Amino acid sequence: MLRNILVRSTGSNFKFAGRYMKSSALLGYYRRVNYYSTKIQTRLTSENYPDVHRDPRFKKLTSDDLNYFKSILSEQEILRASESEDLSFYNEDWMRKYKGQSKLVLRPKSVEKVSLILNYCNDEKIAVVPQGGNTGLVGGSVPIFDELILSLANLNKIRDFDPVSGILKCDAGVILENANNYVMEQNYMFPLDLGAKGSCHVGGVVATNAGGLRLLRYGSLHGSVLGLEVVMPNGQIVNSMHSMRKDNTGYDLKQLFIGSEGTIGIITGVSILTVPKPKAFNVSYLSVESFEDVQKVFVRARQELSEILSAFEFMDAKSQVLAKSQLKDAAFPLEDEHPFYILIETSGSNKDHDDSKLETFLENVMEEGIVTDGVVAQDETELQNLWKWREMIPEASQANGGVYKYDVSLPLKDLYSLVEATNARLSEAELVGDSPKPVVGAIGYGHVGDGNLHLNVAVREYNKNIEKTLEPFVYEFVSSKHGSVSAEHGLGFQKKNYIGYSKSPEEVKMMKDLKVHYDPNGILNPYKYI
Amino acid sequence: MTAAHPVAQLTAEAYPKVKRNPNFKVLDSEDLAYFRSILSNDEILNSQAPEELASFNQDWMKKYRGQSNLILLPNSTDKVSKIMKYCNDKKLAVVPQGGNTDLVGASVPVFDEIVLSLRNMNKVRDFDPVSGTFKCDAGVVMRDAHQFLHDHDHIFPLDLPSRNNCQVGGVVSTNAGGLNFLRYGSLHGNVLGLEVVLPNGEIISNINALRKDNTGYDLKQLFIGAEGTIGVVTGVSIVAAAKPKALNAVFFGIENFDTVQKLFVKAKSELSEILSAFEFMDRGSIECTIEYLKDLPFPLENQHNFYVLIETSGSNKRHDDEKLTAFLKDTTDSKLISEGMMAKDKADFDRLWTWRKSVPTACNSYGGMYKYDMSLQLKDLYSVSAAVTERLNAAGLIGDAPKPVVKSCGYGHVGDGNIHLNIAVREFTKQIEDLLEPFVYEYIASKKGSISAEHGIGFHKKGKLHYTRSDIEIRFMKDIKNHYDPNGILNPYKYI
């Protein structure tokens, strides 16, 4: 069905501030998730995973240890478990899938205190979990047993910003949204955007090498991070907080800490290159009939929208069906249902030019029949509304009772095949269908430019049968296509045993060597990663 | 300090304090027999007369010359692996070599190390036009990579003046910066995967890596810029961008460096996504270049203290022209710039770039030059050039003949905070060298800059890492070298 692009109303003006409203709305949805989830008590990780045992090398905290921490930290920097405070906020992960039993949270206000804590813990062999905003999805920042939690929340100062180069230096505990707000006032933008931006910390974002929606345009953190301040497991402070975009002196050590998930050092400071704030935003929502057409549209967008292309998201039909059930009051942007949908965002410095490029692009792909239907946001409200159809998918996937989430990378031509294969496997096992079958369906959506697929298996309940059908099937499938079992979310505790599906034994050995070298006592974020 | 010499003196003679490591075996006939058993005739160059192997022993700047009498040119990764395993077992020192275009002696032997050349590994392995992922052997020459991608409507995310000689693997090993850095960023962000042969011969490959792969430490990052000291890069996977359909350039005359910075901020705001280069040159650089390019008309009417070349590239020429024209008008009307000229066509575009690309050659044309490649915060970027000029003037060394220094020139990439300092000289003298070093390095350290923004460490800047790196960082680096190359056979006497 060929549908004319809606005539743009004159005088419409997009301001970046609109993105806040969208984010605030999104944050509201997340709060609802939390409220809903509190009805289900999180089980202890140690009970759910009886095969994982507490490492006997690690000391149990004593009053001597507590006295030491009291001698270097103020009262507000120490949180202890008590009858009225079980520290569940710190012990449970964002998804409420993992729960540790830590009795002590330390929240140092300076790098020197972090250093003293780690030096002591290393000497005494006390296990430590560094924690930022605790928004990770693979249990990477919560204790498994009784590890001491070292929170970076009190390290929350902006240290420096150079408005000429755009280089921001800040403490690791600065909340991502606050960092972005700060540079926005000076016409810059953080090169990364996450749904969890209201909670996650800059240091945690770097430690997990978060991807997010801006990777397509601004690249990965390996290119944006200019320097780091890190406290090593033995307490030594390594300061590479450079202001230089180019520094070709020696091995680029900071790169190892990006994505290391707090296993070889605690990031306490970040120097990062922010980007000029775009003056114009546009969003269009399109439908196509096959995943091959999704790829065709992507190729054309890269050619014709090129430097203004800032997001290219695809969603499958079922993901939008689920989203509809959550967005009851919102009108679906298109008239009919289609096998695949595409959300394209452009951002640039000149609205007229961007509008013109987008119009020409859409005319071309619709005339050629690759795109069957589409709309362009006419104003800020519509722009936010179109984004909702993408951003609501995680919430919608979970609304029937739960979701099994997989975040994987695959070559583009194979990107959607995992969803098809998973649905086929679930059907074959007669697990998918209407109630009382436990699986609603496997849906797929993701970032095309990054080759990143989010596979969400929406379920009415969690059960062993589903899990056995999905794993290791999903990982074996990804491996067979030379993909990665974790595109964005990292390894954490959840995917610790699956690294072999994406890395060779030689690579895994090299990684283990690095861990042993920097953390010989294994105290830093144990039981995870590798 | 880098001094260009017409014919290189033996490094061993020029630097008598550097001794051959007695742990390294001297090559013998059994070693030769082994290499002949795994390599074909055309993969081995062996001569007892080092002059015959001069192009492998001597660096691009003709400052360093080794005495290797064996060059191995394997045509596969497996052969590289066998060579490294054998050399590691026998403790034979090895220097990996690509196009040998680096500027700090990183890819030539110091004594009699075996040269392992990648030039026979020159195949494009794969290209995915949907994602832009390009995979090739390390020995593919940059010019050929550019041409291949150009034919497929893509652009390699890095461009270098030495593109006709340098190889993709060497570019990655030295973490070259180049002219596209402002637009496409660093290799740390653009390289997706590497295939590397470790000193012990093990092959480590994540060349099939995708754009997002968040599983474990990102090991490839260590090999980017490692200058062949912990592994030999044999294959590269990199993301190529869509080729721009429109190119434009404008040349400005400006009176002070503060205004250069203001212009940069304005360009980032108004040209934003189409800005692909922002180069500055000082008066001295352009004066040298005007003399050098005698017959080429200077694009501006007057002389100025500073010049800026801005390049834009995008997908729509009309839009880009409008943006750049508006930018030029606005900066002229507000008197931010004294003078500006916009390219009218491709020939104009190339001519404007000639004024930037000719600066190094122009500075070198009086007899030689001392080159420094450094990073500083933008506000301090030009201060090192001014400080050096003042120091040379105070010593009465700059001026007309017979004074030895012609001019002290500063130019570079503003967006990267990268300044190239070129001291154009009629002759090399100890007095100049003593004035420049360690003054330049100490100055950089005092401003918390980097002594090597682009060119790396190599042999030339070994021992100078402490001007930029802390003791703990240097120790960490040495740990890594010792861990991966416990026998120290891979590219010894350099780096750290």
Curated annotation (Swiss-Prot), chain A:
It catalyses: (R)-lactate + 2 Fe(III)-[cytochrome c] = 2 Fe(II)-[cytochrome c] + pyruvate + 2 H(+); (R)-2-hydroxyglutarate + pyruvate = (R)-lactate + 2-oxoglutarate. Catalyzes the reversible oxidation of (R)-2-hydroxyglutarate to 2-oxoglutarate coupled to reduction of pyruvate to (R)-lactate. Can also use oxaloacetate as electron acceptor instead of pyruvate producing (R)-malate. In addition to its enzymatic role it could play an important role in the yeast cell morphology. Interacts with F-actin. It is found in: Mitochondrion matrix. It is an enzyme of class 1 (oxidoreductase). Belongs to the FAD-binding oxidoreductase/transferase type 4 family. GO terms for cellular component: mitochondrial matrix; mitochondrion. It comes from the Eukaryota. One of its GO terms (molecular function) is FAD binding. Keywords: FAD, Flavoprotein, Mitochondrion, Oxidoreductase, Transit peptide. The keyword Lyase does not apply. Its EC number is 1.1.99.40, 1.1.2.4. This is D-2-hydroxyglutarate--pyruvate transhydrogenase DLD2. Residues 98-277 form the FAD-binding PCMH-type domain. It comes from Saccharomyces cerevisiae (strain ATCC 204508 / S288c). GO terms for biological process: lactate catabolic process. PROSITE patterns: FAD_PCMH (PS51387). Pfam families: FAD-oxidase_C (PF02913), FAD_binding_4 (PF01565).
From Swiss-Prot, chain B:
It comes from the Eukaryota. SUPFAM superfamilies: FAD-binding/transporter-associated domain-like, FAD-linked oxidases, C-terminal domain. It is found in: Cytoplasm. Residues 64-243 form the FAD-binding PCMH-type domain. Its EC number is 1.1.99.40, 1.1.2.4. It is an enzyme of class 1 (oxidoreductase). One of its GO terms (biological process) is lactate biosynthetic process. It catalyses: (R)-lactate + 2 Fe(III)-[cytochrome c] = 2 Fe(II)-[cytochrome c] + pyruvate + 2 H(+); (R)-2-hydroxyglutarate + pyruvate = (R)-lactate + 2-oxoglutarate. There is a cross-link at residue 17 (Glycyl lysine isopeptide (Lys-Gly) (interchain with G-Cter in ubiquitin)). Its main location: cytoplasm. One of its GO terms (cellular component) is cytoplasm. GO terms for molecular function: (D)-2-hydroxyglutarate-pyruvate transhydrogenase activity; D-lactate dehydrogenase (cytochrome) activity; FAD binding. The keyword Cytoplasm applies. Keywords: Cytoplasm, FAD, Flavoprotein, Isopeptide bond, Oxidoreductase, Ubl conjugation. Its cofactor is FAD. Signal peptide: none annotated. Catalyzes the reversible oxidation of (R)-2-hydroxyglutarate to 2-oxoglutarate coupled to reduction of pyruvate to (R)-lactate. Can also use oxaloacetate as electron acceptor instead of pyruvate producing (R)-malate. Belongs to the FAD-binding oxidoreductase/transferase type 4 family. Present with 13000 molecules/cell in log phase SD medium. This is D-2-hydroxyglutarate--pyruvate transhydrogenase DLD3. It comes from Saccharomyces cerevisiae (strain ATCC 204508 / S288c) (Baker's yeast).
